Amino acid sequence: MKLISSVEKYKNNLFSVSEEHAVDPSGFEIKRAIVHHNGSAVMLAVDDRKRILLVRQYRLPARSYLWELPAGKLDQGETPLQAAKRELAEETGCHAKHWKKLVTFYPSPGYVAEKMTIFLATGLTEGKAQPMEDERIETRWFTAQEIERGIQSGKIVDAKTMIGYCRWKQVGR
């Protein structure tokens, strides 16, 4: 890929947007607005009873409360695992002894340069959550059957939660 030009159009503390012009390896010219993001860590926390911890919060773009795996963005210079440990403690109050990477993926590669990494977190101890000032988070433990019913019924619609749950069923149990 050959980048011809990149012009930053917008920037805040979460992401930036640039207009880019490039030529792909086959010679095809591409012009696109790209959302740049440091990446996110997603935590699939499983307790000794094989229940999975989900958080519920209002998601403005979806105009709805969503049940989802806890997650958060990587701070500058932070690894996905460091972010996962920090975010799990902040959002849920939980700490994990054991961490295993389940998968890394691009949630929307057509225009967003964000990578998400999902970690399995086990050996949990519970504490007090310390969410950010702009976060209102409810937590609840779900059985695998409850999550499957939630996905099938359309009550769980978050993509990272579905991907994490499916990957856990494949390799994490």
Task: List PLM regions with ranges.
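Unchanged
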Residues: 39-42, 47, 73-159
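A short, amphipathic edge element
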Residues: 1-7
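Generic C-terminal helix-cap and adjacent flexible tail
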Residues: 170-173
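Short beta-strand micro-motifs in enzyme catalytic cores
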Residues: 16-20, 65, 115-117, 138
